[in-house]
Regions:
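Glyoxalase I/VOC metalloenzyme domain signal
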Residues: 2-9, 14-34, 52-112, 119-284
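Short acidic/glycine-enriched loop/turn segments that link adjacent beta-strands
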Residues: 41-44
Length: 284
């Protein structure tokens, strides 16, 4: 039985060392970036969001070291910048937490939090969430997973933030490199009650649910063969490697300029130019 309260990938969290510099970099890559959000003192972090439909990316940075952000800081220390967490959409976080508990995964949370949001008309509102996490030690492919219930969608999916010069529309795949892709994919599939799917080049996909993006586990060598001519410098041997984004490829090519590499029928930003995250723009 698939999880009833978890319905596929909601957003990808890219952990960065300098939050404001990362936001400027993503603006140069043709993304519309939200105003900076600041989380609670307990969380000690801040973020910028890059909104698609029905999902998004989050650039996350530590503003003040706290106990809560210790795992994120440890990730940066060990891996450098890159995809540190993937969020699923939670219909009801309290019920979702009980669902994973029943499957042998003691949940962290649910936890309620919010951050102020400056709306396009200049007024200040709040984005409110209720999240729960699978146990921190359960990190398939080295990436933690959690689920996020949006209590105020209207302060997150703001129409003005959803139009991008690079033509980005939605997440299609989350690419995860690992020496043993099949084992990592099986681990994730068990955690979210999904089936794995073998791909022609030996990679293993795990659908995240509904019409949302798939996870694709593959070796670094397989990733290099999928995207010839794209430098994979800076990627860890095991961890989040990149995002495949459905987009208007011509718009992406124009917006990216010299940062983009034509490969695999689309245009690709190498990890070194994407804050540790490869961005592959493909036809929507």
């Amino acid at each position: 039985m698939a999880l009833k309260n978890v319905i596929g990938i909601d957003h990808a969290v890219v952990m960065v060392k300098d939050l404001d510099k990362a936001a400027e970099n993503y603006k140069r890559l043709g993304f519309t970036v939200s105003p900076r959000g600041t989380h609670s003192a307990h969380m000690g972090s801040g973020n910028y969001t890059i909104m698609f439909d029905p999902d998004y990316m989050e650039l996350l940075g530590v503003l003040t070291p706290t106990e809560h952000n210790a795992p994120a800081r440890a990730y940066l220390e060990k891996n450098g910048e890159g995809i540190e967490r993937i969020a699923f959409t939670a219909v009801d976080s309290a019920e979702g937490a009980e669902e994973i508990r029943a499957r042998g995964y003691p949940p962290v949370g649910p936890t309620d939090f919010e951050r102020p949001v400056t709306m396009p008309d200049g007024t200040v509102s709040a984005a409110k969430f209720r999240t729960f996490q699978w146990p921190t030690a359960e990190a398939p492919g080295g990436v933690r997973i959690f689920a996020c219930q949006h209590k105020t969608r209207e302060t997150v999916w703001i129409p003005e933030l959803m139009k991008h010069a690079n033509g980005a529309r939605r997440l299609k795949q989350v690419l995860m490199v690992a020496p043993e892709p099949a084992a990592e994919a099986a681990h994730l599939a068990k955690m979210i009650d999904r089936e794995t799917r073998n791909e022609a080049d030996g990679a293993v996909a795990v659908p995240s649910g509904g019409d949302r993006a798939d996870f694709v586990f593959l070796t670094k060598d397989q990733l290099g063969k999928r995207y010839p001519g794209v430098s994979l410098a800076g990627l860890p041997a095991r961890g989040g490697a990149g995002l495949v984004i459905a987009a208007d490829v011509a718009a992406a090519e124009k917006a990216l300029g010299v940062a983009g590499v034509n490969s695999a029928g689309g245009v690709v930003v190498p990890p070194a130019a994407g804050n540790g995250t490869m961005l592959a723009f493909v036809k929507a």
